[in-house]
Amino acid sequence: MYQPKLVGKSIGIVFGSFAPLHQGHLDVIMRAKKENDGGCIVIVCGHDGDKGEPLLPHKKRYRYVRELFADDDLVSVWSINDTKIGAAPYPDGWEKWMDEFNSIWHLAVKSSLFPKAKWYVGDECYYNDLKEMREDVVLLNRTE
């Protein structure tokens, strides 16, 4: 499926297993889209046998999220399957996961403008890990 490249000074990054996708996820995606002039990249994450597997395999979750935003040029949906890229389970798989993310970034973003990435996370563990690797990370209050 063709996705136009995102263009802007900043791009939001939202990732999760989306098992299942719910209103809280949609609110985060809309916030990232609103706060970044270039829109946002949504990454559906998972691995073979993850928590969503019994009802919604990773591939199906990715397809649902991608179809939901198919007509939105400011939301670019991608997939990272930890098993397929050989990443160890969290918290040990960040290096391979980030390598895969960097590949996606180059495919999804018009990089000649050198936009900033702004990460949106709702889990303090992810926040702490990402703050060591990336500059702009927002920890969301999941109770709001």
Segments from the language model and where they lie:
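Nucleotidyltransferase catalytic core that binds NTPs
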Residues: M1-E144
